[in-house]
Curated annotation (Swiss-Prot):
GO MF terms held by the record: ion channel regulator activity; toxin activity
Post-translational modification: Contains 2 disulfide bonds.
Role of this protein: Probable neurotoxin with unknown target. Possibly targets ion channels.
Taxonomic lineage of the native organism: Eukaryota, Metazoa, Spiralia, Lophotrochozoa, Mollusca
Highest taxon listed in the record's lineage: Eukaryota
Record keywords: Amidation, Disulfide bond, Ion channel impairing toxin, Neurotoxin, Secreted, Signal, Toxin
Expression sites (tissue/organ): Expressed by the venom duct.
Keyword Protein biosynthesis tagged: no
Species this chain originates from: Californiconus californicus (California cone)
Protein localization: Secreted
Name recorded for this polypeptide: Conotoxin Cal14.13a
GO cellular component, one term: extracellular region
Residue numbers covered by the propeptide annotation in the UniProt entry: 22-38
Modified residues (Valine amide): 66
Signal peptide annotation: 1-21
Amino acid sequence: MKLCVVIVLLMLAMPFNGGEASRFFNQHARSQRSGMKTRGIWCDPPCPKGETCRGGECSDEFNSDVGR
């Protein structure tokens, strides 16, 4: 009984593995990353002390919109 349910669930999940779902998740991950970039949090590598991250780049200007 349980094995049958598992097989049905796998069959239902199959169409989403390569197609729409992965595209959706990739898009979501990209928008999360770009959202972090615009807020000035995402810098790789992290900025030196005294510099803030703006749009993914380090800047020594005072960044007043980051709540620290």
